[in-house]
């Protein structure tokens, strides 16, 4: 189930809010947990048991790690079991495809099993691992109540596509939290804002992108390929940041505060800067649980470069089982290392700032082509024909309408300038007896109304990060 569905917006969300607020405090966590399991089972009934098993497994390891102290073998066993579960469900098909041709000469073959990927397995496995590692490090005590552990892993706003919430960031909120009218109001607005980003912008761009990628790049005009690359760059941002906005807003409605997951990433002036602003919860997770344990930048220049490349290779693998994701991770690792070597010093100079921004946007845009393509070959073909003039066979005129251009202009402005102007305007209006409240609510209600109108009239409503 997705947040941007009519049944969630008009039936399930009002029901859980009503039930939560009329229930006594001792029952609130239980109600959220049961609803979260129901929410997951709605879209993934076969694998809700797998998620419950993952929760109980890591709950047990947390208790054991705390009881027996810093036993590295115990932590290693926990990490290994989690990765084996993740590896089987997410990577078995890919590994079988890659290894079976190599094993054919030895009369060995991995069984041809089409394993279905459970929704959100990368996200909830990452959270579970952060919990056990935090207990091992002594940063927090093991959770004694399995129901609270279940809520931490399965809480429906962030279960399927993040943000990835580290246990030490939310431990106190699980035990004790309050909801204020101001916080609830902010949550509603944030949810509507995210819904608009997803339904109005991301879905519109997705239809064009999917249509173009269905053809050979050689059959599509050069201008259309560039436009498609730009549209996908915007689609994935508004799709994923929209979901994060909705998750953060829902969390606020129930008294939880999640970390921000995006900070205008397309205003970045380097690839390092981009990763400080894009999918922040994942970048933070890899830094805390992979990069720093590997030694970070404390063991010399060469080791730092190896650590960086390792992290970005794993980032690519985390996103998906395929050569395109692996290449995408290596690609970003290359530019991070390049900036560490020498390029970063130039990019930081004020006189190069406009060029630095163009460089960052261009590198990210090309990278997204590999992320979106079905194969490495398709990605390179797409890029090749972006730069090689050729005659188009396929005309995409039916997508080139006023609606697309209007939404494209709005999206480009929303990636940076509009938000900057909004903060300045909001600050001035706030001084005028709070009139911003009425004005902003009118705007949010307009976004909600238009989003619902589009949902009713269009069944095309995918979420990119549900695949991970």
Segments predicted by a language model, with ranges:
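Substrate/cofactor-recognition hotspot
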Residues: 418
